[in-house]
Amino acid sequence: MHALHRSLFLVALLLCMSLAGCTSNDASSSAGNSMTEEEKQLPEWTVGQNWLYTFITPQFGEDSARLVVAEIDNGSGEYVLGISSEREAQRHAVINHNPFLGRMTIDALAVYENGEPQQVFSFPWTVGDAWSFTLLGQQWDATTESLNNGNARVEAESSEGHELSYTFSGSKGFLERLVWRDGDGTIQLRMDLNIARSNYEGDVFFYRARDLIDRMYEENDQEIYD
């Protein structure tokens, strides 16, 4: 009789452990895919939508500025992003300090590098998606690693050993964080989102290198002939 009770107890124990394991696995699976269908989709931006970021680079240290949707050109199918800091806009014009300034495509939020749109984001977000793009002078192979708490996390590696890690917020419609490390492991660019808002009032800036050259020429010209 005691042997029978022991056998029944062991069976019940094993069954409980099995169920616990299944529950744990299901919970882990659910946690790894916790984005709503809406959050997985390509966002639609509006003029004035903005994101306040802290930018960190080895050249310039830490600075904060807002990326702002300054214009929507439905004819060309492009957004134009400006920035609230003129200094940051000038840095971008000289050394491509911020790759998300300027034109981005409406249909994919593709970023322009050397005049060609680059698919940095993969909508709708799906774990395991893999794709390639060029950004920051590097050719990247990227993979969507996880969907968690409304965010899609992407890991990318370049042929030169650089690493790019970034998180896209489905609820805020843009990057939550981005970190670019070079082949030595040094952080070359870090972006951290502080707050996202729908309306912006104020000046925004975007310069190309040609703009700065023209501006310098005009200033020098005025000094000479005044």
Place the predicted regions along the sequence by residue.
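Bacterial N-terminal signal peptides that target proteins for export
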Residues: 1-9
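C-terminal motif of bacterial Sec signal peptides marking the signal peptidase cleavage site
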Residues: 17-21
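Acidic, serine/threonine-rich low-complexity disordered tracts
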Residues: 23-91, 110-226
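A cross-kingdom signal targeting lumenal/periplasmic-facing segments of multi-pass membrane
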Residues: 95-111
